């Protein structure tokens, strides 16, 4: 077995999006080849309604899929296909923009004014860029939860993990997307397929991710880290990008640690990206925006 060393550790950056929503961007809108097939991860977390209530009014997408995971509050959604709904705490929304969709996402806080969720963008391969758009909502009760002997808790959103399969299926990037909670002081090794790009995003507590590629470098609980490279310490709003290997090891801190662990098979295709539209060439991108101006952007009619 080969432990994935940490390739990069960065803090999510404050960003304004939509009509003035304050959020933190873990990665996106730059060179995202190390994250391929993923393009962007936003952490929208706030307890001040004035910082998020303006939301994300009607806007287009083409060429991507989005996975929205809500932990507190709700996100009211509507789109050009006629879909309407609300993503509540613990729920997932998966949207395939495909050939084109126009939608809005309007966050609402819980009774204490808190709003928290994540949105992950996954690229579509060139063969599926112009597929019909589609949409799915998954309720919290449908998401399998695994609790290990040491108290580690895993919610399986997408893909197969520890024998459980998440309810969000059919995403072209074939992601494995899990929400991991490790109790204080515990060390955990988690499998990740070698062929996948993988990252973790810490949003509660803190921990140390093993930064060695040799199995002998795995620490022994209560003894310390034996690797020559020090472990990467990650706390709230830290993104950890991993290098090659087939497993990762994390030591939870005194308050435990909770993080998203996401992996996917790289597409290795050219990316032409501007705002909410992601294609393969600049000409395709130009055409998409021209169609927006001409009113011919939507290729699929709304359901009656």
Please provide the spans of the model-predicted regions.
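Jelly-roll (double-stranded beta-helix
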Residues: 1-304
């Amino acid at each position: 077995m080969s432990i994935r060393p940490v390739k990069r550790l960065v803090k999510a950056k404050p960003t304004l999006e939509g009509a003035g929503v304050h959020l933190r961007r873990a990665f996106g809108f730059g060179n995202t080849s190390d994250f391929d097939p993923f393009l962007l991860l936003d952490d929208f977390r706030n307890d001040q309604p004035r910082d998020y209530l303006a939301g994300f009014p009607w806007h287009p997408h083409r060429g991507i899929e989005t996975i929205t995971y809500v932990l507190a509050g709700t996100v009211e959604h509507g789109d050009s296909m006629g879909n309407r709904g609300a993503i509540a705490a613990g729920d997932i929304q998966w949207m395939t923009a495909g050939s084109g969709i126009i939608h809005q996402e309007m966050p609402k806080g819980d009774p204490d004014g808190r709003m928290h969720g994540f949105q992950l963008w996954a690229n579509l391969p060139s063969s599926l860029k112009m597929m019909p758009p589609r949409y799915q909502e998954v309720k919290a009760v449908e998401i399998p939860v695994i609790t290990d002997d040491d108290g580690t808790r895993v919610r399986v959103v997408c893909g197969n993990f520890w024998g459980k399969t998440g309810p969000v299926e059919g995403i072209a990037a074939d992601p494995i997307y899990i929400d991991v909670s490790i109790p204080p002081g515990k060390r955990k090794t988690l499998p990740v397929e070698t062929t996948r790009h993988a990252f973790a995003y810490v949003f509660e507590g803190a921990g140390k991710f093993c930064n060695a590629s040799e199995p002998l470098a795995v620490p022994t609980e209560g003894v310390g880290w034996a690797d020559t490279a020090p472990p990467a310490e990650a706390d709230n709003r830290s993104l950890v990008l991993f290098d090659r290997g087939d497993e990762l090891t994390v030591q939870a801190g005194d308050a435990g640690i909770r993080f998203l662990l996401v992996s996917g098979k790289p597409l290795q295709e050219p990316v032409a990206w501007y705002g909410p539209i992601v294609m393969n060439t600049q000409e395709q991108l130009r055409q998409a925006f021209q169609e927006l101006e001409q009113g011919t952007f939507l290729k699929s009619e709304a359901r009656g």
